[in-house]
Amino acid sequence: MSEKNAYAQSGVDVEAGYEVVERIKKHVARTERAGVMGALGGFGGMFDLSQTGVKEPVLISGTDGVGTKLMLAIKYDKHDTIGQDCVAMCVNDIIAAGAEPLYFLDYVATGKNEPAKLEQVVAGVAEGCVQASAALIGGETAEMPGMYGEDDYDLAGFAVGVAEKSQIIDGSKVKEGDILLGLASSGIHSNGYSLVRRVFADYTGDEVLPELEGKQLKDVLLEPTRIYVKAALPLIKEELVNGIAHITGGGFIENVPRMFADDLAAEIDEDKVPVLPIFKALEKYGDIKHEEMFEIFNMGVGLMLDVNPENVDRVKELLDEPVYEIGRIIKKADDSVVIK
């Protein structure tokens, strides 16, 4: 038998791999930005850092996946937004350190290469990159029969951004008396889905629960993670924020303390948190303790900003959206996050 047939009999479709590359080119082209060098398909993606105009550049990187939210995308056969989730999880992390995203790379592993489905996945990645103003400069699609089932795939990404050395956000400027502002999340985002899947294990996804304001359950569960780059970057450039917390796995309790020193704490006014309907539904149908919800989910706030009191009005002026004044920084007595 020929080498091609031998490989095909092992479960690897080389021709399908070539087709995927051709299908995704138009999506990758959407993400072009100044600084990108070379073309898709090289051994390494290239970026000219001098094109950023940053005087003292510091590169900041982040990598992440989308957890078991991917299993719901597979279950509901909807693959066009999960890529945006992957980009969001990476770029929101680096924006929290003050970085402007520059470029992104993705990795998709699957049991069977289905070009149409993988095109949808990468189209979602490209949409996320457009929203983050990051170039998709490379990636890998690995067909791994025996490792994954034919319908299964996994997705991960890697983002690199740049910050002016003097504008890095490391929490050192956060102090007692600072105000905590919350930016709304789009939904669950990409964390806590092992619990979400357990709560709704017996649901088809087509249900319209009374708490979800007329939306089908599957649409709410797969709502893509919001990307905060365009909202946060102008604030960073004007040096209006002392700290930023991306509210991901571990909710408020684990993520908010990551932006300040150990002798400080965050006091949160629960009544001012814009809790989304899906979280009320999860608490009800999952019989989850109310306080535990804040240890798992973003509860409607995907990004938290620490600002000086005198900068609050300017921040609200720059942000073309509702901004929630949900708390303040206090001296730590016991817990790092106090929800009142």
UniProtKB/Swiss-Prot annotation:
Chief location: cytoplasm
Reactions performed catalytically: 2-formamido-N(1)-(5-O-phospho-beta-D-ribosyl)acetamidine + ATP = 5-amino-1-(5-phospho-beta-D-ribosyl)imidazole + ADP + phosphate + H(+)
Entries under SUPFAM superfamilies matching the protein: PurM C-terminal domain-like, PurM N-terminal domain-like
Pathway involvement of the protein, from the record: Purine metabolism; IMP biosynthesis via de novo pathway; 5-amino-1-(5-phospho-D-ribosyl)imidazole from N(2)-formyl-N(1)-(5-phospho-D-ribosyl)glycinamide: step 2/2
UniProt keyword annotations, A-Z: ATP-binding, Cytoplasm, Ligase, Nucleotide-binding, Purine biosynthesis
UniProt EC number: 6.3.3.1
Gene Ontology terms, MF aspect: ATP binding; phosphoribosylamine-glycine ligase activity; phosphoribosylformylglycinamidine cyclo-ligase activity
Localization per Swiss-Prot or TrEMBL: Cytoplasm
Name of this protein: Phosphoribosylformylglycinamidine cyclo-ligase
Species, as recorded: Streptococcus agalactiae serotype V (strain ATCC BAA-611 / 2603 V/R)
Source species taxonomy: Bacteria, Bacillati, Bacillota, Bacilli, Lactobacillales
